[in-house]
Amino acid sequence: MASTRLFVLLVIGTVLLCQVSGFLDELLAEHELPQDMTKRGCRNAYSSAICGKVITADDCMRKSSSRMGSFARKKCQRLCGIC
């Protein structure tokens, strides 16, 4: 009886592990930059400590009158995809 429970738990664990590893591959593929964004003119004026951590992609969508929105569009063009 105990060996049957252990076998069922191992099978369920294996199935879940396969699903998670497939899901991680999809997530990594989504976060790759498109080829047109890797050209020379498309870059962030500040390091990734600012463009990516302090300034996020949501800040690119803010109103142009907001400080974060205007800074993001001017200085973090690669992050916002404005190239």
Curated annotation (Swiss-Prot):
GO cellular component: extracellular region; nematocyst
Molecular function terms from GO: toxin activity
Name listed for the protein in its UniProt record: U-actitoxin-Avd8d
Residues in the signal sequence: 1-19
Signal in keyword set: yes
Highest taxon of source: Eukaryota
Keywords: Cleavage on pair of basic residues, Nematocyst, Secreted, Signal, Toxin
Prodomain residues: 20-38
Family: Belongs to the sea anemone 8 toxin family.
Biological source species: Anemonia viridis
Localisation per UniProt entry: Secreted; Nematocyst
Chief site of localization: secreted
